[in-house]
Every structure is written in structure tokens, then in C-alpha cells.
């Protein structure tokens, strides 16, 4: 591995001026302003909930936004993952030697609280770039060059980023897996026993409906980096596009489809987001009527009617449970969305929940196409 990722610093978004992403993250999801910067046509605002940090780059300028790269993309998007590394300069040289494109070579930024060095590397996942950040000893609340923003404590619905899911073009997952392994030290994380890394977890949606391939990757032991999930469509759909294909079409290529945000109390968080005006995908109508589902929900210590009312999915086995709920898209282009996830001992991703998400997004997509 050339540049092992040690920690996820933040996820960056690029949106046009006036797009409400930053406002909605605060109003609907309980994120609080952390630091800001306005210069050269850019308004950069970092927002935080627990250890989860989103950097919203709004507008456009003649230069590049600090700690990132302007993708000049046609639609709003999550465009950058920023990782802490031990030595940004050395990491950049090693990645360049592997053939990686480095559109922003190492830059050192300093303010009264200390200094940081960063470089930006292109990835094979469409417009998604990766920032390699070295900030040991920096004392400020975010990064050099940003002005701290005072804010009241948030509701604490989200404590950290649990996983990141990339929507990929068909057949590209093995290439992406090797790239993240060779460049950042990620390794294959099986989602099912005996899983072939080249094939991942394959799930069919039924005759004429295609299916989904998921490949999970985890960073090296001891790092504080979310799981990375690669999602691609399987051939076989003969009717409408599935949600991965729709993402690729509407996003104009592969990219970050959703971020899973860990919550210590998914019932409370979902209720709070819904009360604030956030919208969630409705699970398939028969989800809560599956044989044994009510018993499983009660075994996890929850009330079936509460989960059903809020659209929370639950999967588990041998006393370990996984609860998930998915928002509608945060962009009018119907691309990027968020997931709230609570783990009660479970470390993977419930296949039952994955199938239910697939079906619920398909149903939502069908309604959108018919509207």
C-alpha cells in the first residue's frame, strides 16, 4: 500500500450557489456549523455531528477550493473524501509512482493554530477525488484557513460515518477494489461466507429485474475509516432502469451514492429528522409482515409498530441486529441520499435489509418515472 488511510477527516460536496444542502444538513439532520471560509467565489462551510464532518463547497471560483478540487460537474455531488495520512508528501510521491494523477500537488497551509499539508489525487471512481491530509499537531477545530463558527450543541442524532457507498459502472468493482487496496491500504471485507472478491455479493431482484453486486472494503486495522461499499448493477433488467443505473445517468457517471451515518438511537433520530421535515423512503409494503419479522424485532428490544411507522428496517441473527432507514435524495437530481444506521452487535450489512432497500428505492424510482 502506498498511502494507508488513517482516518476520515471529512466528505466534501460541490453545489451551486443557493443550493440548500448546508441549510438542510443543519435544519433536518442536526449537523452544526464548525468552520467557514469565503474567498475567490467560494463559500466553504464545514458542518459536524459527532465525528461526522461534511464540507459543503458552494459557488464557483477561478481557483480551487481549499483542501479539494473543483470537478466542474454538471450536477451537485459528493465529490471528495479527505483522509488523514502520516506523511502527505511521501504518500503523494508514492501514488504518483503508481500512475495516479495528482491534480493538486502538496500544499502547506498555516494559520495561528498550526499548519497542515494536503494533496489531491484523482480516483478511478468518476469525479470523486481523494485528499491526503497531514495535520498532526494542528490545534484548531477544523483546518488551517478556516474561521471557527460558534454554534449551540446539536441533538446528537449522528455520532460518526459508518460506511460510504459508491455507485459504479458494470464490471468496474474489481478494478476499484485493487486501486483502493494498492493506493490506500483497503482490503476486501466479505459480506457472505466464502465470498470471491472479484464477484462480491450478488443479489438478483427477480426475472427481468436485474440485480445488484456489492463489494465491501475496509481500511487497515487500527485506522478510523468507514467501510467502503462498491455497488453495481447486474445484467438482466428488461424493464426500467434500476437505482444504480439511474444514479449513473442522473449523476453523469459513477460517484458517491450514499453515506451511512451511525446513530446510537435510530428511533429517536428518525423521529427527530421526520419532525424537522426530513423525508424517508417507505419500505416495501410486505416487509413487516414477513414470517418471524415481528418476533425478530421484539428480540432486538424494539416495538414493531414503531419501526413500521418510521420505516426502519431490522435484520439480524444470533442476537446481533442491524437497524437502517434511508432518506430520500438530498438533491433534486434524485442522486445522493443519507442512511441512518444503528448496530446492536452486528458488524456487516443485513442481506434482508439490502434487498428491502433495493425494492423500496425501485418503487420510489418507479413512482418518480410515472409522475
UniProtKB/Swiss-Prot annotation:
PANTHER family: 4-HYDROXYPHENYLPYRUVATE DIOXYGENASE, 4-HYDROXYPHENYLPYRUVATE DIOXYGENASE-LIKE PROTEIN. GO terms for biological process: aromatic amino acid metabolic process. It catalyses: 3-(4-hydroxyphenyl)pyruvate + O2 = (S)-4-hydroxymandelate + CO2. One of its GO terms (molecular function) is 4-hydroxymandelate synthase activity. The lineage of its organism: Eukaryota, Metazoa, Chordata, Craniata, Vertebrata. Iron-dependent dioxygenase that catalyzes the conversion of 4-hydroxyphenylpyruvate (4-HPPA) to 4-hydroxymandelate (4-HMA) in the mitochondria, one of the steps in the biosynthesis of coenzyme Q10 from tyrosine. It is linked to Neurodevelopmental disorder with progressive spasticity and brain white matter abnormalities: An autosomal recessive neurodevelopmental disorder characterized by developmental delay manifesting in infancy, inability to walk independently, mild to severe intellectual disability, poor overall growth, progressive microcephaly, and axial hypotonia. Additional variable features include brainstem and cerebellar involvement, seizures, joint contractures, ocular disturbances, episodic respiratory failure, and facial dysmorphism. Spastic paraplegia 83, autosomal recessive: A form of spastic paraplegia, a neurodegenerative disorder characterized by a slow, gradual, progressive weakness and spasticity of the lower limbs. Rate of progression and the severity of symptoms are quite variable. Initial symptoms may include difficulty with balance, weakness and stiffness in the legs, muscle spasms, and dragging the toes when walking. In some forms of the disorder, bladder symptoms (such as incontinence) may appear, or the weakness and stiffness may spread to other parts of the body. The gene is HPDL. Gene3D superfamilies: 2,3-Dihydroxybiphenyl 1,2-Dioxygenase, domain 1. Fe cation binds at residues 163, 258, 339. Residues 7-135, 160-328 form the VOC domain. This is 4-hydroxyphenylpyruvate dioxygenase-like protein. Changing residue 157 to R: In NEDSWMA; uncertain significance; decreased protein abundance. GO terms for cellular component: mitochondrial matrix; mitochondrion.
Amino acid at each position: 500500500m502506498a498511502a494507508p488511510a488513517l482516518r476520515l477527516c471529512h466528505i466534501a460536496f460541490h453545489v451551486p450557489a443557493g443550493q440548500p444542502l448546508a441549510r438542510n444538513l443543519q435544519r433536518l439532520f442536526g449537523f452544526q456549523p464548525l468552520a467557514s471560509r469565503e474567498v475567490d467565489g467560494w463559500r466553504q462551510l464545514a458542518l459536524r455531528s459527532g465525528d461526522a464532518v461534511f464540507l459543503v463547497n458552494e459557488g464557483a471560483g477561478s481557483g480551487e477550493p481549499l483542501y479539494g478540487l473543483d470537478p466542474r460537474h454538471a450536477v451537485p455531488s459528493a465529490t471528495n473524501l479527505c483522509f488523514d495520512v502520516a506523511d502527505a508528501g511521501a504518500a503523494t510521491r508514492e501514488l504518483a509512482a503508481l500512475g495516479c494523477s495528482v491534480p493538486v500537488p502538496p500544499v502547506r497551509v498555516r494559520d495561528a493554530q498550526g499548519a497542515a499539508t494536503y494533496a489531491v489525487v484523482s480516483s478511478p471512481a468518476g469525479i470523486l477525488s481523494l485528499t491526503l491530509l497531514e495535520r498532526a499537531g494542528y490545534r484548531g477545530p477544523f483546518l488551517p484557513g478556516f474561521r471557527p463558527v460558534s454554534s449551540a450543541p446539536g441533538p446528537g442524532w449522528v455520532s460518526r460515518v459508518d460506511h460510504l457507498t459508491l455507485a459504479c459502472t458494470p464490471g468496474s468493482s474489481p478494478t476499484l477494489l485493487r486501486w483502493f487496496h494498492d493506493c490506500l491500504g483497503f482490503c476486501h471485507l466479505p459480506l457472505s461466507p466464502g465470498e470471491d472478491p472479484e464477484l462480491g455479493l450478488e443479489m438478483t431482484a427477480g426475472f427481468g429485474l436485474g440485480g445488484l453486486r456489492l463489494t465491501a472494503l475496509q481500511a487497515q486495522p487500527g485506522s478510523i475509516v468507514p467501510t467502503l461499499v462498491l455497488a453495481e448493477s447486474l445484467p438482466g433488467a428488461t424493464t426500467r432502469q434500476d437505482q444504480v443505473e439511474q444514479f449513473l445517468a442522473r449523476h453523469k457517471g459513477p460517484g458517491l451514492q450514499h453515506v451511512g451515518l451511525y446513530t446510537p438511537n435510530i428511533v429517536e433520530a428518525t423521529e427527530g429528522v421526520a419532525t424537522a421535515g426530513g423525508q424517508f423512503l417507505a419500505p416495501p409494503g410486505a416487509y413487516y409482515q414477513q414470517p418471524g419479522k415481528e418476533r425478530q424485532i421484539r428480540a432486538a428490544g424494539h416495538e414493531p409498530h414503531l419501526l413500521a411507522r418510521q420505516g426502519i428496517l431490522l435484520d439480524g441473527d444470533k442476537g446481533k441486529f442491524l437497524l437502517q432507514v434511508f432518506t430520500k435524495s438530498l438533491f433534486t437530481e434524485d442522486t445522493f441520499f443519507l442512511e441512518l444506521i444503528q448496530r446492536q452487535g452486528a458488524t456487516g450489512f443485513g442481506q434482508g435489509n439490502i434487498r428491502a432497500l433495493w425494492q423500496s428505492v425501485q418503487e420510489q424510482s418507479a413512482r418518480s418515472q410515472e409522475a
